[in-house]
Design a protein with these regions (language model features):
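Bacterial Sec-dependent N-terminal signal peptides
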Residues: 1-24, 386, 494-495
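A non-transmembrane, solvent-exposed segment enriched in polar/low-complexity residues
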Residues: 20-170
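Oxidative protein folding and maturation machinery
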Residues: 103-373
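Active-site acidic short loop of glycosyltransferases
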Residues: 376-378, 409, 437, 458
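Alpha/beta-hydrolase fold active-site loops
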Residues: 379-380, 462
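Conserved redox-active cysteine motifs that mediate thiol-disulfide chemistry
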Residues: 384-402, 419
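Thiol-based oxidoreductase modules, predominantly thioredoxin-like and allied folds used
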Residues: 409-425, 436-448
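Thiol/disulfide oxidoreductase modules built on the thioredoxin-like
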Residues: 437, 447-490
Length: 495
């Protein structure tokens, strides 16, 4: 009897696991080799949880066949790419899809059959704007008309698809959610960038007010607190863009006492300005999230913030994670970001060491010659960075360690010059320890920054300058994102 019960339990467990698994077979008749890569759009998901042990990297064909199990609890969008062939798959538990790459006529094509194929035929939605066509527009009328036109065309395409292919209710619900938020997503994404094309005009504030009013009307037309929306990749795209653009807009309004009190309640003006100056990015976005969103949408907005922290700036990362864990102890996103959270905990525990050297009087330097004098007779790589600069954080995380490892037994000095970070010495020290930025450090004043940019020809951040032993210097040719091998070659030629 006991043995029978165990067998029944194992059988139930097997059936449950199978029901949570979708099978996809890719057949490549164009080539026996090659690879398929996957991207998970929408709310952050764990590729390891979906794909298992082989989650990292791409997946390779063997004799033209690739079989992949995907673990899903509900209809999940997955974007695949294989050479020039790419598209969305909407995968449900129990699906058994066959995706065939072949030549039909004079074109490479994709044919999808099998269980779940009714959710995965060609849909033909228009999901992006031709930004070039509107690049000189200072008012939103034309782009709004185009968005409305696209929306109507997409609605027709979806209804045509439903009639022809009979997709599942879950697919129809997902498409309805995506369509509901697409106009808002397109407008917020476009208008946020478009302001840079007219910000030098005398009537900038009046123009921006027109764009803001149109955006508000789109926001009022939908419910951005809808808990159902958290499953939509389009809503997540909107939410991430909205947080970015709202943050930028509020930066321009921080002198307004009403705005300041909303986001820094209970503080004096001086306290609020100090708090805002210390972290106008991660911590400020967290304040926005808690002011603007509730429930599941608040949790999703936190996930967007954690995703940005994972990608670039780690300022106040541990404190934000602590608050998120306390607020949502059972959140699925804690599993998604577990590797990043572990890394943050480890790095936050680091302290400054004697190899992290702050040049005495460096904050008072007014010209690049004073910097050169301090490193006279040395080969030096200068990293121009800033605590506020996302790409700087990305490049330090990616390249600082490998560069130091490469030149470990060679006479190369590493120097980090922070820019536009006056008054943020304590914040800089935390980041320097966090990223283990061993080397020489200067927190430049504006005069020094301007002189360095003028003399070296650097035009932005991050930038890299190589100083030779004879005191001459040159700008890195490695570009951005950094071509590390190119920079290594340039430094070695300077030794």
């Amino acid at each position: 009897m006991k043995r029978c019960l165990i067998i029944c339990l194992l059988l139930v467990q097997y059936i449950f696991v199978q029901a949570q698994t979708a099978k996809i077979t890719f057949e490549n008749t164009l080539s026996k080799t090659g690879e398929v890569g996957f991207y998970l759009p929408g709310p952050p998901k764990s590729s390891f949880q979906l794909f298992g042990d082989s989650a990292e990297g791409n997946y390779f064909f063997k004799d033209g066949i690739l079989k992949q199990d995907i673990h899903v609890k509900e209809l999940t969008p997955i974007y695949y790419y294989a050479g020039k062939l790419r598209g969305y798959l909407y995968v449900s538990p129990g699906d058994d899809l066959h995706v065939k790459f072949s030549r039909i006529g004079d074109k490479d094509s994709v044919t999808i059959t099998g269980k779940g194929a009714n959710n995965n035929q060609y849909l033909g939605l228009t999901t992006s704007l031709n930004r070039e066509a509107f690049k000189n527009d200072t008012l939103p009328d034309r782009v709004l008309a185009e968005i409305k036109k696209m929306d109507l065309q997409n609605q027709v395409a979806i209804q045509r698809y439903i009639k022809k292919h009979k997709p599942t209710k879950a697919w129809k619900d997902m498409m309805a959610l995506n369509q509901k938020y697409t106009p808002l997503d397109l407008f917020v994404g476009f208008s946020g960038n478009q302001k840079f094309s007219y910000r030098n005009k005398k009537n900038y504030r009046e123009l921006k007010a027109v764009w803001d009013k149109k955006q508000d009307s789109l926001l009022n037309a939908v419910d951005i607190q809808d808990t159902k929306a958290v499953k939509s990749e389009v809503f997540y795209s909107f939410l991430s863009d909205y947080l970015l653009r709202k943050k930028e807009s509020l930066w321009e309004q921080m002198k307004d006492s009403t705005v300041m009190q909303k986001y820094y309640p209970g503080m004096t003006r001086e306290e609020a300005l100090k708090m805002h100056s210390s972290d106008s990015e991660n911590q400020f976005v967290e304040r926005m999230i808690n002011q603007e969103f509730q429930g599941k949408v608040n949790e999703l907005a936190y996930a967007s913030l954690l995703n940005n922290i994972q990608r670039d700036k780690k300022t106040n990362a541990a404190a934000i994670i602590d608050r998120f864990e306390k607020k949502y102890p059972d959140s699925e996103y804690l599993k998604v970001f577990a590797p990043m959270i572990s890394e943050v905990r480890t790095n936050e525990a680091r302290k400054l060491n004697d190899k992290m050297i702050f040049i005495p009087g460096g904050t008072e330097f007014s010209n690049f010659d004073q910097v050169l004098e301090k490193v006279k007779g040395k080969t030096v790589l200068i990293d121009l960075w800033g605590s506020w600069c996302g790409p700087c954080h990305q490049e330090i995380q990616k390249n600082a360690g490998p560069l130091k490892k490469h030149f470990a037994d060679k006479d190369v000095t590493f120097m980090y010059i922070a820019n536009y970070d006056e008054g943020k010495d304590e914040q800089l020290k935390k980041l320097i320890a966090y990223y283990n930025m061993e080397g020489l450090h200067i927190n430049a004043n504006r005069t020094l920054t301007d002189d360095i940019l003028k003399k070296t020809g650097a035009s932005g951040f991050p930038s890299y300058i190589i100083i030779k032993k004879d005191g001459s210097y040159e700008l890195s040719k490695a570009g951005y994102p950094m071509k590390r091998d190119e920079l290594i070659k340039q430094i070695e030629e300077s030794l």
